[in-house]
Amino acid sequence: MTGNVEHEPMRHRFVVRLPEGEGELVYRPTAAGALDLIHTGVDPQLRRRGIGEQLVRAALAYARAHHVRIIATCPFVARWLEKHPEERDLVAER
């Protein structure tokens, strides 16, 4: 079971809340206008349910819709992008 991803721009995160816990993807806006995706965390009882992927996809959809690039500082996001090269056009040059 997965939940709906909510964007909390004031807290710089995307979050999924379920009765058993929550997952979040935290970002930091950069001076260049990119989103630095810095941390993905999912409560242990929710792991292996695709919550992390759901969060990454939501962040990338947001970036695409708002014409901003991303930086994949978070190791989970970086590994996910390695497996999904079709999304790498969103990655900012460093």
Model-flagged regions — what are they?
Residues 1-34, 38-40:
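N-terminal first-folded block
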Residues 38, 54-60:
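Short, hydrophobic/aliphatic alpha-helical segments
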Residues 43:
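Residue-level recognition of the GNAT/N-acetyltransferase active site
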Residues 46, 50-55:
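Conserved acetyl-CoA pyrophosphate-binding loop and the N-cap/start of the following alpha-helix
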Residues 58-94:
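C-terminal structural segments of small proteins and small subunits
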